[in-house]
């Protein structure tokens, strides 16, 4: 659908296709869009996923719930991000986590089967493989964060990643405190206490989701 072309371009999916061929590639793919309300599940863990997903508007988080009811946030996907690729590209095609809308969100779906039939299959597949590699790097980075013993170190490493990404010492954590705590695998109270200590010690400053590394 032509209205999703800009989102698809921004996702990088067509980056190996010549610009004048974008419309041709778009018309060969089976593309649908769907709106979800905040808190709605796009997929649950173990659901079958046979399509790639791109955030058109809003944001999505992947999370896992453990036996005791504890929730860990794995990743946050913002506008134009591709997600659920590891499931769609796998042999079993089962979701490794729950994918939940962080806000009112619109998702673009592209079935893997339509990519396989597309004239530009090779170009698109190359991009998807690069995306998978990038996702693996992000997972490695999170393992490094969680491998830190001290909560303060975890916070600083995460903020430093955002600083490098945004090119500024003032960054935005697009999670509320509960979600940020779940991402760092700690309680909300522990996170709030540590953030307040760091603020008093003038290591960071913050107001809601806005953080500044001092």
Please tell me what each predicted stretch does.
Residues 50-63, 79-80:
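Glycine- and acidic-residue-biased ligand/ion/polar-headgroup-sensing regions
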Residues 162-214:
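Phosphate-/nucleic-acid-contacting segments
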Residues 1-38, 77, 82, 87-90, ...:
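Cyclic nucleotide-binding regulatory module and flanking cytosolic helices
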Residues 61-73:
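A short beta-strand-loop-beta hairpin characteristic of the jelly-roll/cupin
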Residues 73-130:
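Cyclic-nucleotide recognition modules
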Residues 41-47:
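Short phosphate-coordinating micro-motif centered on Lys-Gly-acidic
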Residues 28-29, 47-49:
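Short, small/polar residue-rich loop motifs at catalytic or cofactor-binding pockets
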Residues 102, 122-185:
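Polybasic "coupling" helices that flank or enter modular domains
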């Amino acid at each position: 659908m032509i209205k999703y072309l800009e989102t698809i371009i921004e996702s990088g999916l067509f980056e190996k296709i010549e610009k004048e061929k974008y419309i041709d590639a778009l018309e060969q793919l089976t593309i649908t869009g769907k709106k979800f309300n905040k808190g709605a599940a796009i997929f649950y863990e173990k659901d079958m996923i046979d399509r790639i997903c791109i955030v058109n508007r809003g944001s999505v988080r992947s999370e896992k719930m453990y036996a005791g009811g504890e929730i860990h946030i794995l990743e946050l996907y913002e506008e134009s991000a591709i997600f659920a690729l590891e499931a769609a590209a796998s042999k079993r095609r089962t979701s490794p986590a729950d994918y939940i809308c962080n806000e009112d969100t619109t998702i673009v779906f592209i079935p893997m089967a339509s990519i396989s039939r597309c004239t530009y299959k090779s170009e698109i597949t190359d991009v998807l493989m690069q995306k998978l590699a990038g996702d693996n790097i992000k997972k490695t980075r999170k393992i490094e964060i969680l491998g830190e013993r001290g909560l303060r170190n975890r916070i600083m490493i995460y903020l430093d990643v955002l600083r490098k990404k945004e090119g500024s010492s003032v960054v935005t954590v697009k999670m509320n405190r509960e979600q940020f705590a779940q991402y760092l695998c700690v309680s909300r109270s522990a996170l709030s206490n540590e953030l307040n200590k760091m603020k008093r010690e003038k290591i960071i400053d913050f107001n809601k989701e806005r953080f500044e590394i001092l």
